[in-house]
Design a protein with these regions (language model features):
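Non-catalytic cap/lid and distal C-terminal segments of serine-dependent acyl enzymes
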Residues: 1-285
Length: 285
C-alpha cells in the first residue's frame, strides 16, 4: 500500500458490483485554490503503487503538478481475482460466436462475463468521482484517465465517447484488437468533432516495442503456435502507431496527441514506463 493512501469500499448502485478505491492525496504543497489535479487509474489493484510513487517523485520538480491519484479496483488482495473482475468492466459486448474465434477463444472465460464497460463509465461518473470529491478538493479541469491493456482500451473508448468527462487520457498498450477492433468504430465521429473544434483534450497512447515480437514462453498453458497467433492477431504496435498517426493528422489546436513506443518493453513490462511517461505528459507545465 502506497504512503498516505486511503481505501474506500462500496457496492455500486449502477451494476451491483463491489469496488475498492485507493486514494493518495499529496501533502508536500498547499492545496491549490482551484483544487487538486487528479489521475483516475484503472486496475488500481495492480498499478496504484507504481502510479503514486511515480507521481510523487516527478513532483519533486516545481514544474510538475502533484496530483491526487485514485486507483479504481476491487475489494480483494488476489491478483487473479482482480484480473477476473476487471473483464466485464473493461470490455464492450461481444458475441458468443466471436468468443469462439482467434486469440480470445484460448483465454480462460472470466466468471463475470464480458460487456459491462458502459455501466463502468457510469460507476466512475456517478459513484467514484463524487466519493473522491467528498474527500478532497478536485479541480474538474484537471482530470486524467489512465489505463493499461484492457484499461487502455477503456481509456480509448472514453476519449472517443466520453471526452468531456476528462481533460487528458493515457492509454498504455491498449487492447485495440478486442472484438475485431470494435473501438475504432467510434473513431470517425470523434475525428469529425475534433475537426469541428468541439474537442479540447490531450491524449498519450503508448505501447511496448516488443509487444509485436513473437516470443514463446515455456511453462504457460499455451503452445508456441498459440503465442504466434496471438502476436499476429493483436498487432499491438501497428495498431497503436496507425491510430496515433491518424489522430495526429487531425491537426487541431485544441487536441494534442502523442504516441510513444517504449524500447525493450513487452506487454507485462510496459506499465511502469507507460505510467511514468503518462504522469510527465499530463502533469508537467
Amino acid at each position: 500500500m502506497a504512503l498516505n493512501a486511503r481505501v474506500i469500499d462500496f457496492t455500486s448502485k449502477v451494476n451491483d458490483r463491489a469496488y475498492r478505491l485507493f486514494v493518495s492525496i499529496p501533502t508536500r504543497r498547499p492545496v491549490p485554490p482551484e483544487g487538486h489535479a487528479v489521475v483516475y487509474l484503472i486496475d488500481g489493484n495492480l498499478h496504484f503503487g507504481i502510479a503514486v510513487d511515480t507521481a510523487r517523485i516527478q513532483a519533486c520538480w516545481p514544474d510538475v503538478i502533484d496530483p491526487v491519484v485514485v486507483g479504481i479496483g476491487y475489494p480483494t488482495d488476489s491478483v487473479n481475482q482482480a484480473l477476473d473482475q476487471r473483464m466485464i468492466d473493461l470490455t464492450t459486448p461481444i458475441s458468443e460466436e466471436r468468443l469462439k474465434k482467434g486469440f480470445i477463444a484460448k483465454m480462460p472465460r472470466p466468471t463475470t462475463g464480458y460487456g459491462g464497460m458502459d455501466e463502468y463509465f457510469r460507476v466512475i461518473e456517478e459513484e467514484v468521482k463524487p466519493r473522491v470529491e467528498a474527500l478532497v478538493a478536485i479541480n474538474k479541469l484537471e482530470q486524467v484517465l489512465m489505463g493499461h491493456s484492457l484499461g487502455g482500451l477503456t481509456t480509448l473508448h472514453a476519449l472517443f465517447r466520453h471526452t468531456a468527462s476528462f481533460q487528458q487520457f493515457v492509454a498504455i498498450a491498449p487492447s485495440i484488437w478486442y472484438n475485431d477492433r470494435a473501438v475504432l468504430a467510434h473513431e470517425a465521429a470523434f475525428s469529425e468533432r475534433v475537426r469541428a473544434g468541439q474537442v479540447k483534450a490531450r491524449a498519450l497512447i503508448s505501447v511496448g516495442e516488443l509487444e509485436s515480437t513473437f516470443r514463446f514462453v515455456p511453462g504457460l498453458p499455451a503452445s508456441e503456435q498459440d503465442f504466434r497467433d496471438m502476436t499476429e492477431e493483436c498487432r499491438m504496435v501497428p495498431n497503436v502507431q496507425e491510430l496515433g498517426a491518424r489522430l495526429a493528422a487531425l491537426a487541431s489546436p485544441q487536441f494534442e496527441i502523442e504516441t510513444v513506443v517504449h524500447a525493450g518493453d513487452d506487454h507485462n513490462m510496459v506499465p511502469p514506463a507507460g505510467i511514468a511517461r503518462g504522469i510527465r505528459f499530463t502533469m508537467r507545465r
